[in-house]
Regions:
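Cysteine-cluster motifs in flexible loop/terminal segments that predominantly coordinate metals
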Residues: 1-19
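Intrinsically disordered, low-complexity regions enriched in small/polar residues
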Residues: 4, 13, 46, 79-80, ...
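Sequence-level detector for tyrosine residue identity
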Residues: 11, 72, 77-78, 130, ...
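Rossmann-like dinucleotide/flavin-binding elements
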Residues: 16-51, 55, 90-98, 102, ...
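N-terminal Rossmann-like dinucleotide/flavin-binding domain of flavoprotein oxidoreductases
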Residues: 57-101
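N-terminal Rossmann-like NAD(P) cofactor-binding module of classical short-chain dehydrogenase/reductase
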Residues: 107
Length: 155
């Protein structure tokens, strides 16, 4: 059963859980981190899994953008809150369905998959995604064309 809770950013009560549960959170990106520390603060036992070697997901890409260095502090905050709230962190771990059977509930926060637009020539070797450039450090020429005008395109 799904229960929606409406909250305002200005006012949030973190009430103790009536029934404490053993929770698995799959994905240590922004959503998984926020859920894990809030659930643990309410008294749940939380295990946070991520297949990567560090927490943060897309924050680790964003922090590389000039002017977005505050994400380093965001990640420092989450690392500290994981310790303070007692969240069990399992990095470099691809969790299986069998392993998740040991938990009362599983929260999937497994992140995003970049969308590739259906454009002729998109598979050309000179066409790079933001992940190719920022995460994988692919070299970029002196002249570039950016496709897309969302947040990533502007950054």
């Amino acid at each position: 059963m799904f229960t929606a809770v409406l909250m305002s950013e200005k006012y949030q009560n973190c009430l103790p859980a009536v029934q404490k549960k053993n929770l698995a959170v799959v994905g240590a990106g922004p959503a998984g981190l926020a859920f894990a520390i809030n659930a643990a603060a309410r008294g749940h036992q939380v295990t946070l899994f991520d297949a990567h070697s560090e927490i943060g997901g897309q924050f680790n890409i964003a922090k590389q953008i000039p002017g977005k260095e505050e994400f380093y502090e965001t990640l420092r905050y989450y690392r500290r809150m994981i310790e303070v709230t007692g969240v069990t962190l399992k990095l470099n771990h691809t969790v299986t369905a069998d392993q998740l059977q040991a938990f009362d509930e599983t929260i999937l926060a497994s992140g995003i998959v970049p969308r590739t637009p259906p454009i002729d020539g998109i598979d050309h070797p000179k066409v790079l995604s933001y992940l190719d450039v920022l995460r994988d450090k692919a070299p970029v020429g002196n002249k570039v064309a950016i496709i897309g005008c969302g947040g990533i395109g502007f950054d």
